[in-house]
Amino acid sequence: MKISTKGRYALRLMLDLAINHTGSYIPLKTVAQRQNISDKYLEQIIHQLSKAGFVQSARGAQGGYRLTRTPDEYTVGEILRTVEGSLAPVSCLDCKTPCDQFDSCITIGLYKKIQQAIDGVVDHTTLHDMISDYRAKHPKTENI
């Protein structure tokens, strides 16, 4: 499994909204500037996150985006799967119809263990966890 640029940027976008989570709407251009990411690229990502119900939008002068839940209610896994799709290390773990060799495959056990390890990390790590870990290591940093 390799996390794409889209996945990394989605995490950074959600972390930025989480860090600045006051209930107010944050313009996407502000996030783009803070994260040094193209606002056009973030528009594509925010659309997926909005469609999934992770963020709420408002138009107008005071418009922008905000989280629909608290940072401790979002896991890295659900964010990545929303923009990346499956996090399986090999395609045969995703298939609804496994390949002919699935039952006798010598490597499938390893791939399943890798999948479990990935899921164990991303499904048990929240935005809040990531922010807390970062701040513990960088106490003088206000924004990430």
Role assignments for model-derived ranges:
Residues 10-22:
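Short amphipathic alpha-helical interface segments
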Residues 46-47:
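Short, hydrophobic-biased segments on the C-terminal half of alpha helices
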Residues 54-67:
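Beta-hairpin "wing" of winged helix-turn-helix
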Residues 71-95, 107, 111-116:
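Conserved segment of winged-helix/HTH DNA-binding domains
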Residues 95-144:
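C-terminal regulatory/oligomerization modules of transcriptional regulators
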Residues 40:
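Key DNA-contact positions within bacterial/archaeal DNA-binding proteins
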Residues 33, 50-51:
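Alpha-helical residues within the helix-turn-helix
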Residues 26-36:
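A short alpha-helical element within helix-turn-helix/winged-helix DNA-binding domains
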